[in-house]
Amino acid sequence: MEIDLMKHIQKTKFIFVTGGVYSSLGKGVSASSIGRILVELGYSVAMQKLDPYLNIDPTYLSPLQHGEVFVTKDGKEADLDLGTYERFINADLNKYASVTSGKIYYEILTKERENGFDGKTVQTIPHVTSAVIDYIKKIKDSLKTDFIIVEIGGTIGDIESLPFIEAISQFKTIYGVNNVMFIHCSPLIYIEKVGELKTKPTQHSVKTLRSLGINLDLLLLRTNQKLDEVTIKKLAWSCGLDIDMIFAAYDVESVYLLPNVLFEQGIHKTILDFFSLPLKNDNINSWIDFTDKITTFKKHNLVIGLVGKYVELPDAYKSVLASLELAAIELNIDLKIKYIQPQNLNENNINEELKKINGIVIPSIAGSIKGWPGALLAASYARKNNIPFLAVGTGVNIGIGEFINNVLKLPIEFINLGNGDFSFLKDAFVKNEIENYRIGEYCSNIQANTITSQIYLKQNQLNERHRHHFEFNNHYINNYFLNQNWKIGAISVDNNYIDVLEYTKNHFYVLTIFNPEYTSKPSKANPYFINLLKMSLKIKES
């Protein structure tokens, strides 16, 4: 790595966000909230996640351990936090926005096996740290925004994250101290019996950061208690910060309210002053208009059933839930989600379990066959009772399988992947032999006189993100479905692939082989989720 002490002012400013004391602190939402404020003030923002785990990416991580796999526009399988980033800053990120230790080490070791280091000893410093810095530069060069906010995964003090911490310490020297800000998120522990906020864990976390070469520029405290002046002064003194560099990320009713909380404290002024940047706009009124819809009295209420293999961890369906939430906010609906484990559904309890459900969503499902009978029962209940139904991604198997089983009376067979799991139904789906894996954004032609044409008003095409190896078998669908009250809602622009199927006897029974949840944004929830709720409400109140 060449050390170029660039002390002059850089156009792109960097904010690095670390977390202390324990994981699942909410630093991703905190970082995203800062990003949203900067966007509202007229600055362009990109975000990046540096994750210390040794998986190359989250493709094969269990959803029960790590939550959903998010997919970027350019086809990167990424940490679910990227979905949070995109929704908050209202921007599409790219393949450089998600980097893991596993990816860094894999690339270094591959290069070493090819003698790419000319016989040099490969070490954490400088080779690993330089690789991290290269990825930080790549997102800057590819997205060219005013700000880049980088979240460091894990907790300060974890051995896994040390190369990342060293890398960002070096980066500040390389890029210029006036162009890089360090923010640390840390909890204040409230002892209810004595009514006291304990600051010692945060003090130790900051001390650990200092020992690793990171001097804080701003401290963001997670707490559900109002910060008092004594606590702020105590932390300022012990952490070597001015009191105006300490802010509180209070617990809020909705994560989308956190930008409001931070803006009211003036965090934007501190950040802009640090970088010597002007205050282009003195309000975040457009965001407040959106969040006012969250806190206002709801005129309507709905219950949507989410049927999925991993409902024990809702984060496994993070973007689906976010899409439903954002759609409900737009429509002024008090939305309740009923999580339904398909393995618990059977012929004896299906009516009781679903009788109060106004709509059903089946997200991507993969893995063992155990939950199939219950999932098919849910799809059958929706089809027979005209319950609005949306199956996305690999969840289209359920809508197709139910019809094959109950209407066509054909046997259900699965494509054997050789590991006890299934991916798609045999015959109804075929492996994509041309592209192998459709992942990322693809364009589809909307077909006339369909539900899709009604919800994508004045559009002839749609752009959605895919993540699948298999496609609808066009021949099978043409022979068995299109003469049985099914329509093609959208087809790929090259006419090779069916992307949307719709059952026309129901008001809203839609199967999308792409994952529409990935493109929902505040004030612009994906149309499929908007119309699922619209139709659910219409049927309920009719």
Swiss-Prot record:
This is Putative CTP synthase. The keyword ATP-binding applies. It is an enzyme of class 6 (ligase). One of its GO terms (cellular component) is cytosol. One of its GO terms (biological process) is pyrimidine nucleobase biosynthetic process. Its EC number is 6.3.4.2. Catalyzes the ATP-dependent amination of UTP to CTP with either L-glutamine or ammonia as the source of nitrogen. Regulates intracellular CTP levels through interactions with the four ribonucleotide triphosphates. It comes from Ureaplasma parvum serovar 3 (strain ATCC 700970). Homotetramer. The gene is pyrG. It catalyses: UTP + L-glutamine + ATP + H2O = CTP + L-glutamate + ADP + phosphate + 2 H(+); L-glutamine + H2O = L-glutamate + NH4(+); UTP + NH4(+) + ATP = CTP + ADP + phosphate + 2 H(+).
